Design a protein with these regions (language model features):
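Glycine-rich, basic loop-to-helix element that forms the pyrophosphate-binding segment
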Residues: 63-81
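A recurrent flexible, glycine/aromatic-enriched loop bordering the glycosyltransferase active site
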Residues: 159-171, 181-200, 231, 253
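A conserved acidic beta->alpha catalytic loop
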Residues: 29, 35-47, 93-95
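Short, well-formed alpha-helical segments that are part of the catalytic scaffolds
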Residues: 12-26
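Short beta-strand-to-loop acidic/aromatic patch adjacent to the donor-nucleotide binding site
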Residues: 82-94
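Active-site-adjacent helix/loop segment of glycosyltransferases
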Residues: 236-309
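Conserved donor NDP-sugar-binding/catalytic core segment of glycosyltransferases
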Residues: 98-166
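A short, conserved alpha-helix in the catalytic core of glycosyltransferases
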Residues: 192-209, 216-242
Length: 340
């Protein structure tokens, strides 16, 4: 099965090199690697020129194609016509040697799969427990494994605002648990949302779908938007044996005020992708959880070391929420597969 790897990057030459070196060590190597660089300098271009990687093509995009979703759409337009699977990786990830072997084999195991995601293994400490285990209020339990729950979910459980869906599925009021809440069992799980930076899709779906132009620049939640639309047409899976590490490089991220606004406004947009006409109870829950999460972040002004960062992001969230009363998010160009 032929597959292409698209890596969209911005001002991160060293993390990108680390990723490419891990790709070089793969037991199954990509038929094509496309580097889509939105950098405003030539450091990444120079790094690529100094290092040789088989099947690699480099593109430095102009301003009009800069930004995660634009770069992804640009990359898709450059994929070889013979390719069957298109893979995406964040530029600050590092793969285990059998990542692609396990990821691509999922399409053979599930021939009707439209998309398959990999598994980030370095962000959460999981512990295997007995099958009859009863989790504590500050724990999350799933499929024989437990992990510590964050303060936001602990409070949500106490207030009756926890999600009623499995990890990787979005409830009618959104604010679900991501695929990051799937344990490292080595199993393959069906989901309806994939993390864009560790995802793959059959190339044929791009004849119908594209990444939304609403998500410009950093593109927060663009992966949720895209995968939710695709999941309405077919099955998506996460293979927890396709492992990689994510190191969250600082370069190329928006300021925290803009990020806070994105959390709320982009979150609202994705919620309406899943549920374009929510019932009153779902509207109330979405707003209640959004306000609760803002208050939790605001409390970090007192509890966290970086008080300025907590305040700046909280202000962005507050302004983002109020802005929904004035102007709700709307895609500049309605993407195919979207009903809103």
């Amino acid at each position: 099965m032929t597959f292409s790897l698209i890596i969209c990057t911005y001002m991160r030459p060293q993390p990108l090199l680390d990723l490419l070196q891990s790709v070089q060590n793969q037991s199954l190597y990509p038929n094509e690697i496309l580097i889509i660089d939105g950098s405003t300098n030539v450091e990444t271009k120079e790094m690529i020129a100094k290092n040789h990687f088989e099947n690699l093509n480099y593109f430095l995009v102009a301003k009009e194609n800069r930004g995660l979703t634009k770069q992804r759409n640009f990359g898709i337009s450059k994929v070889n016509s013979a390719i069957e699977i298109v893979c995406f990786l964040d530029d600050d990830t590092v793969l285990e040697t059998d990542y692609f072997q396990n990821l691509i084999s999922t399409y053979t195991t599930f021939p009707k799969a439209l998309g398959v995601g990999g598994y980030i293994s370095n962000e959460t400490n999981w512990e295997k427990v007995q099958g009859n285990y009863t989790p504590k209020s500050n724990e999350f339990y799933f499929d024989g494994w437990k992990r510590k729950d964050g303060s936001r979910f602990i409070l949500r459980k106490k207030m009756g605002l926890d999600t009623n869906r499995l990890p990787g599925f979005s409830p009618a009021f959104s604010h679900g648990r991501s695929v990051g809440f799937l344990p490292p069992t080595g199993k393959i799980y069906e989901v309806e949302q994939l993390m864009g930076g560790v995802s793959s899709f059959r190339k044929i779906i791009f004849d119908t779908f594209s990444f939304s132009t609403y998500f410009e620049g950093y593109g927060l939640y663009e992966d949720a938007d895209f995968s939710l639309r695709v999941s309405k047409m077919g099955k998506l899976y996460v293979n927890t044996s396709a492992k990689l590490s994510h190191f969250h490089a600082e370069g190329g991220r928006p300021n925290l005020y803009k990020y806070g606004k994105m959390v709320v406004r982009n979150g609202w947009y994705v919620w309406r992708i899943k549920n374009p006409k929510p019932m009153l109870k779902d509207r109330l829950k979405w707003n209640a959880i959004t306000i609760l999460l803002t208050l939790i972040r605001l409390s970090n002004v007192v509890t966290a070391k970086n008080k300025k960062a907590a305040f700046t992001e909280s202000l962005g969230r507050i302004i983002g929420w109020w802005s929904l009363l004035i102007k709700r998010p709307k895609d500049k160009k309605k993407p195919v597969g979207l009903s809103i």
